[in-house]
Structure formats: structure tokens, C-alpha cells
């Protein structure tokens, strides 16, 4: 889902990167990341993910597939963590540029590197992000939007 693009961009930067998850390309990614400050954490359960993502400066979603509504974006935002997401599928609809994160061109290592640097230099209001995301994605808010569709409002 864009792991190679992320690793290639991160190799050129002085920041520590922690990657959660795994898959059939993991060995290839580890080879690509050799000699860098990139740590592969493997699969994690939600309590660990919540702690890791909640403490992160920001989360990167380097998707190269058209995902309609990736939960990883919503989860990070609800934890107060800004998201740097690929401009593909439904991701741009979930990220308010400069407020809840930033976007980069999917599969574009140069743009991703530039946006990672921008994310580190940008100041986000983490508490406001968490609060607005929790309100936006709460059960009550979802129910109200669904009822508005049914009633034609």
C-alpha cells in the first residue's frame, strides 16, 4: 500500500520512522531500509496501535490503492494525530490541509519527502484535532448524517 514509496522518501531524511504492520513485501522493505533509522514494528493489536499512533508527531498513510474511507486516517485523527496522506481515493476527503494534516501525490517519493519535512515544521493544534475528529466521527454524528439522507435534509 505504498510502503516502498515511504521507505524511499524516509531514507533521505534525518527522522526516525516506525512502521506498523506487515505483509508479503516486508523483507523487500527491510532490505530497502537497511542502514537507516526505520523501525519495523510488525502487526500490533489496537491498544498498542492506539498508544503508538497517539504519541506520534504525525501518521503517514502512503496508499497507492483507491480506498474509500480508510479507518487508519480516522483513527489517527481521533487520537489527535495529524495525517500525511496520499492524494488518492477517499483520503483527501478526510484530511483538511494544514489543519488535520497534509496531502501528497500518491507514488511520488519526492513530494512525500517534501511533505514529511513540511509536517515536521508545521504547528498543529493536536487537542482541537482530536476533539473535532471525535465529534465528526462519533456514533451520534454518523446517525444524524444518515437520518439526514433518509429525510432528504
Model-derived segments and spans:
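A conserved mid-protein helix/loop that constitutes part of the nucleotide-sugar donor-binding site
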Residues: 1-12, 24-27, 110
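Acidic donor-binding loop of glycosyltransferase active sites
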Residues: 54-68, 81
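Short glycine-rich donor-binding/catalytic loop of glycosyltransferases
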Residues: 64, 81, 85-92, 106-107
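A charged, aromatic-enriched C-terminal amphipathic alpha-helix characteristic of glycosyltransferases
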Residues: 121-151
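Nucleotide-activated donor-binding/catalytic signature segment of Leloir-type glycosyltransferases, i.e.
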Residues: 27-47, 51
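Conserved acidic donor-binding segment of nucleotide-sugar-dependent glycosyltransferases
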Residues: 97-98, 102-109, 117-123
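Short acidic/histidine- and often glycine-rich active-site loop of Leloir-type glycosyltransferases
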Residues: 73-74, 88-98, 102-103
Amino acid at each position: 500500500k505504498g510502503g516502498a514509496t515511504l521507505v524511499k522518501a524516509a531514507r533521505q531524511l534525518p527522522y526516525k520512522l516506525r512502521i506498523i504492520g506487515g505483509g508479503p513485501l516486508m523483507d523487500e522493505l527491510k532490505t530497502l531500509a537497511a542502514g537507516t533509522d526505520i523501525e519495523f514494528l510488525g502487526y500490533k493489536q489496537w491498544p498498542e496501535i492506539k498508544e503508538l499512533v497517539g504519541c506520534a508527531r504525525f501518521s503517514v498513510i502512503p496508499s497507492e490503492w483507491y480506498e474509500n474511507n480508510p479507518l487508519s486516517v480516522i483513527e489517527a485523527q481521533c487520537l489527535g494525530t495529524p495525517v500525511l496522506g496520499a492524494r488518492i481515493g477517499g483520503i483527501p476527503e478526510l484530511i483538511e490541509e494544514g489543519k488535520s494534516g497534509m496531502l501528497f501525490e500518491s507514488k511520488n517519493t519526492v513530494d512525500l519527502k517534501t511533505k514529511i519535512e513540511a509536517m515536521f515544521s508545521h504547528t498543529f493544534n493536536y487537542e482541537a484535532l482530536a476533539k473535532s475528529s471525535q465529534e465528526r466521527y462519533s456514533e451520534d454524528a454518523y446517525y444524524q448524517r444518515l437520518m439526514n439522507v433518509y429525510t432528504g435534509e
